[in-house]
Amino acid sequence: FYPKFGFLPAAEAQIFSPSSPQQPIPLRRINPDNPKDRALLIQSYRRSNPFSAFSMENNEGLLLFYALGPFRHFLYTPPEENAVAILEEDGDTLFCHELLGEWSGSLFQTLNRLTQPRIRKIGLGFTPKDTLPGQIWQSGEDHLFVLGKKENPFAARKLFFPLISHA
């Protein structure tokens, strides 16, 4: 369907890295129905993901779609409450869909402070700026299309379009 409008399929891959749980950050689950928590989520979104190679901007509507729907129970904030993590556990894997706002330390340190001892690997819902130790790329199941007449950033290197920007 999309190719007849000039769009071409682009290969997308997701990063997975082994976990090394460290002293965990205590997290509080946030409730997107609570006005204070929703404001924190939006403020953190506006500060973006400091670890991401690229991110979605000016699309609070899509963020709220995920926050009020499929990711409702995966929203967490650290004690400082100046950031939001969208985290989902599946067996021994922690999916870090997004890290929004202000986080201290490197991505590797932050991820491993968000994991519990039972977690063996971490999957990212975004493309990190920096390489993670032991990272591997796995082909995604989603279908991504780019406009054929424009530059295709997915052709030159492996990327994962931020999960919370998938429409």
PLM regions: where:
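Short sequence/structural segments immediately N-terminal
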Residues: Y2
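Amide-forming acyltransferase catalytic core, primarily the GNAT-like/NAT-type
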Residues: F7-H97
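N-terminal charged segments
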Residues: R38-P79, G105, T127-A167
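Active-site/acyl-donor-binding loops of N-acyltransferases
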Residues: F5-I25, E98-G101, N112-A167
